[in-house]
Amino acid sequence: LDWLVYHATEVQEPVKRSFYAHRHTLRAGDAEALRKRASDLFTQRWALVEDHLVQAGPYHLGERFSLPDIYLLVTSTYSKDLARGEFPAIDECVRRTASRQRIVPILEDHLRGLGRIASVGVPQ
């Protein structure tokens, strides 16, 4: 449960600040600085996940696949560019999760949804 909450609150928060910087600033000129700070926070939080997976992986619960692995996969589809650096343990967890037979259709549906969002734009 700890990792699921971590992803939902700590990892997701800077993603929202980056994508919706205009919602978190009083002056339009501050949005880019906020995006940079969000990227810094995301990188720090992604690094904590990386360290955990290096120590305990390949999944969040070692050899046991779990819901936080799905959350990591989904988050990685739209936010990995926020992180600066290399994250091979995250990449491996994402690869393993994405290749699971029951996850494939879920991921395909998620990616179609991202495509629809991209075609209409991010709500302001």
What residue ranges belong to the model's regions?
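GST-like fold's C-terminal all-alpha helical module
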Residues: 3-98
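Residue-level signal for secondary-structure boundary elements
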Residues: 12, 102-105, 118-119
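Acidic/histidine-enriched, glycine/proline-rich intrinsically disordered or flexible terminal extensions
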Residues: 110-124
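Charged phosphate-binding loop/patch that engages nucleotide di/tri-phosphates or the phosphate backbone
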Residues: 96-112
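Juxtamembrane helix-loop transition sites at the ends of transmembrane segments
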Residues: 29, 90, 102, 120-123
